[in-house]
């Protein structure tokens, strides 16, 4: 069956255009008639007369043909006009008959039920002033939207397909009327209508209409008590948002859809965000007087953000922000809401609200949500009362299997004391703790920074301490987070300045990964007072570095101590610098973290005053029990500068270096802090002691300047009187083992890492494809009701073809929504089917990886090239050939060492030097063992000139003992005129079999399966 679509207006326009063309042609033919049909003869002779008659006959024939064409043209234009009129009439008759049929169909239901079968409901009466309007009429039972309500009237409900009508806004007269409720959406498809807004600030908003199967819930209207949110369709749809002012929860999403946002409020807590299954949770509502609403939770998607807290109208205290929504399976947690700021009650500053905790991530994948910031504390203006404390930052959310922990929230600022207040300004809020990283992989979250302590504006008040930085989150496989920085202490005008907040501890890595760095301490508060003013505030201590993982990982660096607060003329002395944090220790393999530097003592400016003492430095972390270097000790804090005839501050000692255990060097001691300038200058600190070296191998760390000589751990070469060959054997063996270990620590188990990364990538690709396909399938299903609605409209207009097209298109789009042909070489299907296509690539990728591994382990090719112009070259071997070369190196170096020892013994005997002969004989076992383990040699291999372009080339093949490091090949080419030139060849290295097995081969296999 075929269909013909005709637009009558276009046919009529075409006929008019053709008539215009015919008119122009007729005028041209008339103008040419006389000159071409009656030609005058050029002469009186017979030839001229014959020529005139001939061409005149041509003109007459043209006019005859033109007349016939004009007749045909007129008939064709008439037919076009007639066809257009016929189509127009048929269309009008069809519409008329369809309208008559529609009226006949609607009549029974309109009479019995007061609503049509197909059609929109009537809008409610508008209403005037304080007089409420009418409710919107219901939509058609099969199809139609509900009518909108008049002033304060409810929206009409839809039938099977259609949207609910919007509730009318409340009337503005008098106290203002409540908004009307939104109408319910269609049973099969349709959105709920929006609730009407209240007519005044004191009036209630209307509730949003509900959806049933497919459709979004209506939003509640705003008002003094806003309207409730409409429910989403059961299968697909977003939950409605609760009305502003309601403090009600947002509606939950359908099976596929987002939760609605909670309503804000000025009289109670903010509403919670709606929950979801496959979609994002709704955001919590904010409140100006109470706690913020919690963010909505979800199964697959992102959690909603928590709402901001407000300020209590009764007490002036800040109220906590809402917690971020958590995720069940896949997705990131929502951010916590900010805590509310505090004000004062009868002049007394109140405490601020804490930030909301970040939501936890999904079980399979996702990052924890960030914690909300704490609010600022209230200021105090009356005597004897403290100012408000800043709110603590919210904790970051935790990850589950894969993902990073959330960052902790920033602490709020402490309140100030002003006027005649004589108590203490508020302390800054503590930073929130970072979230824990994923169990299988992920980094811990960073701790939040502490808040600034409140300043003491009046001379009788004490300044507030800075808030402590948040502790960082730990990790299982991954790096621990960094600790939050401590907040600066508040400044004072005479009495005590605020102490700087301590930095948060770095996060610990539990299995594999490095510990996080500790946060820096906050700066001590300055004191601007003059005579008899208190010292500047002490700087905050730096946070300790986190420990490295049980199997591998470096300890985190300790945080630096905060600088001491400065003082003005007449004050006692500058503030003492904060203590540096201790570096984190490694457990089995890894280096200890560097100790944090001590804070600089505060300077004294103007008049006579003593500079502050430098803060003590942190010690370096200890190395892993098996292998690793100890951390360097922190630098001692420098003393602050004195003024006038007063002394500068004393510098502190440098931190001790961390110790090694079995293999590794001790950490160097930190440098002592410089003494502060003054009269006299402050004494400098001593350098820290270096850490002890490993028992099997390692040197003790150097003492930091300007300290005494390092207390060196006795090494084997200095404490055990053995012969040189045995010393070389032990030193070379330990050095090569250390090199192998360091290379492995830099990239442990690369093949296993790449394999696990591939599997995780396949899993993520599969879950993403299934999630996208499920979402697009639901979107396609949701598109069927609107298409049916469009098809009904087309049928009502007599357009059967359009109706069929709408229905078929909707069914197809459930599976394929379109085609992406932007790249003709890679045309892609869109929609659920196209979403699933990437999964089909996984078996091929796995098969290709297996093939690549097989090809790598069976590759016996050798490739060589040299560019004598640019002095570059490449020498590559297949993996089995490279491993064979590495395996045969040890027998060669052993034989060389045996031959050298034999030659030395024979030469000494022949020379009559019995002492040298005895030494060669005693040292021979060590030399042979050293050759077997650590020997290195290069074997010359002359290449045929036919393979080198006629230039003589000799390749030096590196061979080594089983522990010898891998070395590149070298080639020497004898270039005419220039002479011999040595080129280091890129490509495959060669050496000991152990580093080849531990480091080189796994790297080659990892590259074989890398995407």
Curated annotation (Swiss-Prot):
Keywords of this entry: Cell wall, Secreted, Virulence
Q: Give me the ranges of the annotated region PGRS domain.
A: 130-696
The answer to whether keyword Secreted applies is yes
Q: Taking every annotated instance into account, which residue ranges of this chain make up the domain PE?
A: 1-93
> Where located?
Secreted, Cell wall; Cell surface
Phenotype of the disrupted gene, per the record: Deletion mutant is attenuated in vivo during murine tuberculosis, specifically during the chronic steps of infection. On day 28 post infection, shows a slight reduction of the bacterial burden. On day 70, shows a strong reduction of the bacterial burden. Mice infected with the mutant show smaller, non-confluent tubercules. Mutant shows impaired ability to survive and multiply within murine macrophages. It is unable to inhibit phago-lysosome fusion in THP-1 cells.
Ranges where the record places region C-terminal domain: 697-1011
Physiological role:
Mediates suppression of pro-inflammatory immune response in macrophages via modulation of host cytokine response. Required for full virulence. Involved in inhibition of phago-lysosome fusion.
- Similarity comment: Belongs to the mycobacterial PE family. PGRS subfamily.
Q: What is the UniProt domain comment for this protein?
A: Both the PE domain and the non-PGRS C-terminal domain possess independent cell wall localization signals. The PGRS domain is responsible for polar localization of PE_PGRS30. PE and PGRS domains are necessary for the cytokine-modulating function. The non-PGRS C-terminal domain is not exposed on the surface and is not required for full virulence in vivo.
> Any other comment in the entry?
Infection of human THP-1 macrophages with M.smegmatis expressing PE_PGRS30 results in reduced production of IL-12, TNF-alpha and IL-6, as compared to infection with vector control M.smegmatis. No differential effects are observed on bacterial persistence inside macrophages or on macrophage mortality upon infection. However, expression of this gene in M.smegmatis is sufficient to enhance the ability to persist intracellularly and induce murine J774 macrophages death. Differential response of the human and murine macrophages could be due to cell-specific processes.
Write the protein's name: PE-PGRS family protein PE_PGRS30
Upper taxonomic lineage: Bacteria, Bacillati, Actinomycetota, Actinomycetes, Mycobacteriales
Q: Gene name?
A: PE_PGRS30
């Amino acid at each position: 069956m075929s269909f013909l679509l005709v637009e009558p207006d276009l046919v009529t326009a075409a006929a008019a255009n053709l008539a215009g063309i015919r008119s122009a042609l007729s005028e041209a033919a008339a103008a040419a008639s006389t000159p071409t049909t009656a030609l005058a003869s050029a002469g009186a002779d017979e030839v001229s007369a014959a020529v005139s008659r001939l061409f005149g006959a041509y003109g007459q024939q043209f006019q005859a043909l033109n007349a016939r064409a004009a007749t045909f043209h007129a008939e064709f234009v008439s037919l076009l006009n007639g066809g257009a009129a016929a189509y127009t009439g048929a269309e009008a008759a069809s519409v008329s008959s369809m309208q008559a049929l529609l009226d006949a169909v609607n009549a029974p239901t309109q009479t019995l039920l007061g609503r049509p079968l197909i059609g929109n409901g009537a809008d409610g009466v508008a209403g005037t002033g304080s007089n409420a309007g009418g409710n919107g009429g219901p939509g058609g039972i099969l199809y139609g939207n509900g009518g909108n309500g008049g002033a304060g009237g409810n929206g009409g409900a839809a039938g099977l397909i259609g949207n609910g009508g919007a509730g009318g806004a409340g009337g503005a007269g008098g106290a203002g009327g409540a908004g009307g409720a939104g109408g319910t959406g269609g049973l099969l498809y349709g959105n709920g209508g929006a609730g009407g807004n209240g007519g005044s600030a004191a009036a209630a908003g209307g509730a949003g209409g509900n959806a049933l199967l497919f459709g979004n819930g209506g939003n509640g209207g705003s008002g003094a008590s806003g309207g409730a949110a409409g429910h989403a369709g059961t299968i697909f749809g977003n939950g409605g948002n609760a009305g502003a002012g309601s403090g009600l929860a947002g509606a939950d999403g359908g099976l596929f859809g987002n939760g609605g946002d909670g309503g804000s409020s000025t009289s109670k807590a903010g509403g919670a965000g709606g929950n979801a299954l496959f979609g994002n949770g709704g955001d919590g509502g904010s409140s100006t007087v109470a706690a913020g609403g919690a963010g909505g939770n979800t199964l697959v998607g992102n959690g909603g953000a928590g709402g901001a807290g407000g300020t209590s109208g009764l007490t002036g205290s800040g109220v906590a922000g809402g917690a971020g929504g958590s995720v069940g399976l896949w997705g990131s947690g929502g951010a916590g809401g900010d805590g509310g700021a505090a004000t004062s009650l009868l002049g007394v500053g109140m405490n601020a609200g804490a930030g909301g905790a970040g939501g936890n991530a999904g079980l399979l994948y996702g990052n924890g949500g960030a914690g909300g910031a704490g609010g600022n504390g209230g200021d105090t203006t009356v005597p004897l009362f403290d100012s408000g404390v800043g709110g603590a930052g919210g904790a970051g959310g935790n990850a589950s299997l894969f993902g990073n922990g959330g960052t902790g929230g920033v602490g709020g600022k402490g309140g100030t004391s002003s006027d005649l207040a004589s108590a203490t300004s508020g302390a800054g809020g503590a930073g929130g703790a970072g979230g824990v990283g994923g169990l299988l992989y992920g980094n811990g979250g960073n701790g939040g920074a502490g808040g600034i302590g409140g300043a003491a504006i009046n001379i009788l008040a004490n300044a507030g301490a800075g808030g402590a930085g948040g502790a960082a989150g730990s990790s299982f496989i991954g790096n621990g987070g960094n600790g939050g920085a401590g907040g600066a202490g508040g400044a004072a005008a005479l009495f005590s300045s605020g102490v700087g907040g301590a930095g948060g501890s770095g996060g610990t890595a539990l299995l594999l990964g490095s510990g996080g760095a500790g946060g820096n301490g906050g700066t001590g508060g300055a004191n601007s007072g003059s005579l008899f003013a208190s010292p500047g505030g002490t700087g905050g201590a730096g946070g300790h570095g986190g420990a490295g993982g049980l199997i591998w990982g470096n300890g985190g660096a300790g945080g630096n101590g905060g600088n001491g607060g400065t003082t003005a003329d007449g004050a006692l002395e500058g503030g003492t610098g904060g203590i540096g944090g201790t570096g984190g220790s490694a457990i089995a393999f890894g280096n200890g973290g560097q100790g944090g530097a001590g804070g600089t003592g505060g300077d004294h400016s103007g008049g006579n005053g003593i500079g502050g003492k430098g803060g003590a430095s942190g010690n370096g972390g200890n190395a892993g029990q098996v292998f690793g270097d100890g951390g360097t000790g922190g630098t001692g804090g420098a003393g602050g500068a004195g003024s006038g005839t007063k002394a500068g501050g004393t510098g502190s000692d440098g931190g001790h270096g961390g110790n090694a255990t079995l293999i590794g060097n001790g950490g160097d001691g930190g440098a002592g802090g410089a003494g502060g300038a003054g009269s006299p200058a402050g004494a400098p600190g001593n350098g820290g002691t270096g850490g002890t070296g490993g028992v099997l191998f390692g040197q003790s760390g150097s003492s930091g300047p300007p300290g005494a000589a390092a207390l060196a751990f006795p090494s084997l070469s200095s404490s055990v009187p053995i012969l040189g060959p045995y010393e070389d054997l032990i030193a070379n063996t330990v050095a090569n083992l250390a090199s192998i270990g360091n290379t492995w620590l830099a990239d442990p188990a690369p093949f296993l890492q790449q394999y696990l990364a591939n599997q995780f990538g396949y899993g993520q690709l599969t879950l993403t494809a299934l999630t996208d396909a499920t979402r697009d399938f639901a979107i396609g299903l949701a598109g069927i009701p609107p298409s049916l609605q469009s098809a009904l409209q087309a049928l009502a207009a007599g357009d059967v073809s359009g109706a069929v097209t709408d229905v078929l298109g909707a069914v197809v789009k459930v599976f394929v929504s379109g085609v992406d042909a932007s790249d003709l070489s890679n045309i892609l299907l869109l929609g659920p089917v196209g979403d699933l296509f990437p999964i089909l690539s996984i078996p091929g990728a796995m098969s290709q990886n297996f093939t690549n591994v097989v090809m790598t382990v069976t590759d016996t090719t050798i490739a060589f090239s040299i560019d004598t112009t640019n002095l570059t070259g490449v020498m590559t071997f297949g993996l089995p050939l490279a491993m064979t070369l590495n395996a045969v190196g040890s027998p060669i170096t052993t034989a060389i060492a045996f031959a050298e020892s034999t030659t030395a013994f024979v030469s000494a005997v022949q020379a009559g030097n019995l002492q040298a002969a005895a030494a060669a004989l005693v040292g021979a076992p060590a030399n042979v063992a050293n050759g077997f383990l650590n020997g290195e040699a290069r074997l010359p291999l002359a290449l045929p000139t036919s393979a080198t372009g006629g230039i003589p080339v000799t390749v030096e093949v590196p061979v080594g003992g089983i522990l010898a490091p891998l070395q590149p090949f070298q080639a020497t080419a004898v270039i005419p005129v220039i002479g011999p030139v040595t080129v280091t060849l890129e490509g495959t290295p060669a050496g000991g079999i152990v580093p080849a097995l531990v480091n080189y081969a796994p790297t080659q296999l990892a590259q074989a399966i890398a995407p």
